[in-house]
């Protein structure tokens, strides 16, 4: 199977920061 890992993800629209340094880890079998 597989897993998903996102580290230090940020999103901004222009100068407006929506999210900053988000981490997400989904282990095998959790999705």
From Swiss-Prot:
EC main group: translocase
Protein origin, superkingdom: Bacteria
CC annotations in GO: plasma membrane
SUPFAM superfamilies: P-loop containing nucleoside triphosphate hydrolases
Keyword Cell inner membrane annotated: yes
One Gene Ontology term of the molecular function aspect: ABC-type maltose transporter activity
UniProt keyword list: ATP-binding, Cell inner membrane, Cell membrane, Membrane, Nucleotide-binding, Sugar transport, Translocase, Transport
Keyword Transport: yes
EC number: 7.5.2.1
Record localization: Cell inner membrane
Record membrane topology: Peripheral membrane protein
InterPro entries the UniProt entry points to: P-loop_NTPase (IPR027417)
Disulfide bonds: none
Catalytic activity: D-maltose(out) + ATP + H2O = D-maltose(in) + ADP + phosphate + H(+)
Subunit (UniProt): The complex is composed of two ATP-binding proteins (MalK), two transmembrane proteins (MalG and MalK) and a solute-binding protein (MalE).
Function statement: Part of the ABC transporter complex MalEFGK involved in maltose/maltodextrin import. Responsible for energy coupling to the transport system.
Entry similarity comment: Belongs to the ABC transporter superfamily. Maltooligosaccharide importer (TC 3.A.1.1.1) family.
Protein name in the entry: Maltose/maltodextrin import ATP-binding protein MalK
Gene name tied to this protein: malK
């Amino acid at each position: 199977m597989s897993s998903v890992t996102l580290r230090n993800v940020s999103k901004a629209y222009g100068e407006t920061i929506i999210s900053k340094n988000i981490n997400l880890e989904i282990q095998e079998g959790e999705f």
